Amino acid sequence: MAKPHETILVLDFGGQYNQLIARRVRELHVYCEMHPYTISVDAIREMNPKGIIFTGGPASVYEEKAPAVDPAIYDLGIPILGICYGMQLMVNQLGGKVGRAESREYGKASLTITASEGPFAGMEGDVQCWMSHGDKVEVLPHGFVGSGKTDHAPFAAMADPVRRFYGVQFHPEVRHTPQGMDMMRNFLFGVCGCTGEWTMENFIEEQVAAIRARVGSGKVLCALSGGVDSSVAALLVHRAVGEQLTCVYVDHGFMRLNESERIIKTFRDELGMNLIAVEASERFMAKVAGVSDPETKRKSIGNEFIRVFEEEAAKLGQVDFLVQGTLYPDVVESGTSTAETIKTHHNVGGLPEDMKFELIEPLRTLFKDEVREVGQRLGLPEDIVWRQPFPGPGLAIRVLGEITKESLDILRHADDIVFQEIKKAGLYRQIWQSFVVLPTTVRSVGVMGDGRTYEYPAILRAVTSDDAMTADWARLPYELLEKISNRIVNEVKGVNRVVYDITSKPPGTIEWE
């Protein structure tokens, strides 16, 4: 079905900033979709996009089997912006020449604008940009003019205003290109003729109508975790079909302090939704008893969740649809043609293939910040809208080693202290995730009072991120770190040392397991 809104098509060549391109387009209130570069010309015609963006990628266009689009795309009469590899591909396919650069360009560079065309409309002189490439354009295709240059790249940008084809060798989508959003705005509104009419209000209206039409009189089931993703998905479906939706919340015993009680109260009492709460902590503890391998933990918990969920679903009789809070980054991180699977993801592919439900994934095209906005507009309580991401297996993968009731209690208490202090410092919304990891296979010597102690260290992890695809360790104030450390060591029995993890992603992941 054709999209009801003006659409920008982003073609994915495997670059590290590709999702960021889509995010920037959405920030300008223009709907966009990302598709593999192998998409057919017929599919593009059916989509009828206002413009196409070719992303960056790790390949070189002159290599054998380098990713390339169907050349017929250039005959559609649709504006195209090529970014980094995307620009080089345009050059290569349209008759120009790309070669290896004498010196690579990585990081900040000064771009001299030589033609105020397309993305550079209204700009002149030198602007800062972010480069990440080892190849350069040597000869422009017929019809193009150079529109920007750097010390190492004579054609750092190009323009063919007649066909509305543009290319930039740098990355306008990253914050390190300060005028990058202006360039994106110029392309979307000036070149493609977009009006910026896509909003979260529109999204809600359209999703509610689409869900209502699809479900009809059918019964809908939702596995509710209490996180922002499944909560917003459930609330959106509830807005569409009301009592036809039943939510199942499985308390596996690995939640944070008082979290299960808060989830049940919110959805059953405050939001008036049909909620079945299953207390299954003993079942889950039995499944992970003696298990220390992280992937085995994840799979054991995931499999047991499926069994509990299936049992509850069977009690409801005929159910036609299943709601999942899948987001766009979930799909990418669980593996696509251009992104390797990093670890078993708890949302995507977590339910058995033989379950006789049709999937409803109303948030599948959204990023986390958009989901939060939808939640706010639907009236979801602030503490859930801004709840930090929490892994499906919960605290089970934050206890390194075997899980016991004692280790879970220690971790819960320490984690709650971090939550309290970060919130009190006014930093909770600025931080993507902040939590404690408890390595039960390690003990450290300490001195408390007049005696020596031999207890667990607690690892504090706090990161900043836009979408969890990349993350940086949070520069928490020393005074806050000191307060957290003092409270944990003094108030949590079993911990005598606190350390702070200052690893970014990559090379690390946000979670330890």
Swiss-Prot record:
InterPro entries: Class_I_gatase-like, GATASE, GMP_synth_C, GMP_synth_GATase, GMP_synthase, GMPS_ATP_PPase_dom, NAD/GMP_synthase, Rossmann-like_a/b/a_fold
Keywords attached to this entry: ATP-binding, Glutamine amidotransferase, GMP biosynthesis, Ligase, Nucleotide-binding, Purine biosynthesis
Classification via SUPFAM superfamilies: Adenine nucleotide alpha hydrolases-like, Class I glutamine amidotransferase-like, GMP synthetase C-terminal dimerisation domain
Pathway it works in: Purine metabolism; GMP biosynthesis; GMP from XMP (L-Gln route): step 1/1
Highest rank taxon of the organism: Bacteria
Active site (UniProt): C84, H171, E173
Chemical reaction(s) catalysed: XMP + L-glutamine + ATP + H2O = GMP + L-glutamate + AMP + diphosphate + 2 H(+)
E.C. number: 6.3.5.2
GO cellular component: cytosol
A GO molecular function held by the record: GMP synthase activity
Glutamine amidotransferase type-1 domain boundaries: 7-197
Residues annotated as binding ATP: S225, G226, G227, V228, D229, S230, S231
Domain GMPS ATP-PPase: 198-387
Gene3D superfamilies noted in UniProt: 3.30.300.10, 3.40.50.880, HUPs
Enzyme class: ligase
Self-association and partners: Homodimer.
Function: Catalyzes the synthesis of GMP from XMP.
Protein known as: GMP synthase [glutamine-hydrolyzing]
